[in-house]
Amino acid sequence: LISSILNFKTAIQEQNSFPGYTNRLLSKRVKLIFVAYNNLEKIFDNNNVLNLGNPIRKYNINTNQDPFNYFNLDENKKTILVLGGSLGAKSINEGILNNLSIIRESSFQVLWQTGDYYYDHILSKKIEEKNLVIKSFIKRMDLAYKVADIIISRAGAIAISELSYISKPLILIPSPNVVDDHQRKNANEIFRNGGCLLVEDKDAKDNMLNQAINLLDNSEMKIKMKKSLGKLAKPDAAKNIVSKIYEQI
């Protein structure tokens, strides 16, 4: 705000599908607005709205390292990757804990990032399912993405941008504990474009795994999701944003 008052050339970046109050306020005073979703020019009172995507880390999922060996997984089984962020997500973790009997009898396997906050509690359950690999945090996300046939995740802005780039079939469970309900709005936008299934946080405990199992067996839907996510992906967002900024200097 001070920069614009002093007549410096300024820009903002809105990462979510619906802008927060601060960016809506600043949008009236900045030179450029970078966004990651379509139709935000209707919300911002500014003609210079550019949809260049969110800057992400570009993982190389074509690495030669064997990801199944790294995670001690069976390369002949379909894999569900479950992510709840670095701290974890209670509802997503309950969606696994409450369905251990289904996992035990299944032909698929699960790579489960519990988050640091829930890890010790989950280990105390002494889970012994051979087709369930439990991690507090996954450092090698490139390998995790490579083994995944489908991914279950929260719906943060950067997570969605990264998952669009990866373009694996996706189930999003937006957190209800986010200012302006950004995660739900983000997830709805991806769902509207055919890039994911959407499970409400309150339903994850009972419905999440069933949705994942059904998706594993639905080849047509998986192909559609991959194509939709690929169209939404903007892997060169960081470079393109910087280039536009340099043009203004």
Q: Language-model segments: which ranges?
A:
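Active-site-proximal region of nucleotide-activated glycan assembly enzymes
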Residues: 5-65, 73
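Conserved acidic donor-binding segment of nucleotide-sugar-dependent glycosyltransferases
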Residues: 197-203, 214-219
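C-terminal alpha-helical cap of glycosyltransferases
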Residues: 234-249
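Well-formed, non-transmembrane alpha-helical positions, independent of function
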Residues: 24-25, 42-43, 125, 143, ...
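Short, hydrophobic alpha-helical segments
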Residues: 212, 216-220, 245-249
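A donor-sugar binding/catalytic signature common to diverse glycosyltransferases
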Residues: 141-182
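Donor-nucleotide binding loops and adjacent catalytic segments primarily
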Residues: 64-66, 73-151, 183-188, 192, ...
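A short, well-ordered alpha-helix in the C-terminal region of glycosyltransferases
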Residues: 221-235
